[in-house]
Regions:
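Conserved PRPP/pyrophosphate-binding segment of the phosphoribosyltransferase/PRPP-pathway fold
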Residues: 1-119, 127-162
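Basic, glycine-rich
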Residues: 124
Length: 162
């Protein structure tokens, strides 16, 4: 489920939350996202940041969105389901092949989830590389159904090699 494409005004709202610390955008965006979800998964999780990036930024925008969305939908949120065990360069501007390589072994599942239907929350999905890695971890432990809830999606970057 996605609110829309990465363009004005959604792109501005996401940018303000992520880079300008305008935290009031999180509940607003979560409410917009909730309107797109007819049958929510019983458990939400979010895309984790490496501890260094979280320390530098001071917060994880996907975590903020997931917390707000869980409140709006009145469902469980597990903020510790995943961890990012390896710091990776920013994904922005990388080709699909570079993103896949960049994320190799970057994530770990901290514990088996307590549900068979889970939704992963992220702010922006571009190629889906990050989401794909997290889905693989969930599928490996027997999760039956995975939904993706994001604010924006972007067109796949042009890559003549990938």
């Amino acid at each position: 489920m996605c609110v829309g494409d990465y363009r004005f005004p959604l792109s501005d709202a996401v940018h303000q939350l992520k880079y300008q610390r305008q935290f009031w955008q999180a509940p607003r965006l979560a409410k917009l996202l909730a309107t797109q979800i007819n049958e929510p998964a019983p458990l939400l999780c979010s895309v984790p940041l490496h501890w260094r990036r979280r320390w530098q930024r001071g917060f994880n925008q996907s975590d903020l969105l997931a917390r707000e969305l869980a409140n709006v939908l009145n469902i469980e949120y597990d903020h510790q389901l995943f961890a990012r065990r390896r710091a990776t360069p920013h994904q922005q501007g990388l080709s699909k092949a570079q993103r896949i390589h960049n994320l190799r072994d970057a994530f770990v599942l901290n514990h088996p989830p307590n549900q068979q239907h889970i939704a992963i929350v992220d702010d922006v999905v571009t190629t889906g590389s990050t989401i794909r890695h997290l889905c693989d971890l969930l599928l490996d432990v027997g999760v039956q159904s995975i939904d993706i809830y994001c604010i924006c999606r972007t067109p796949e970057p042009k890559d003549s090699k990938g």
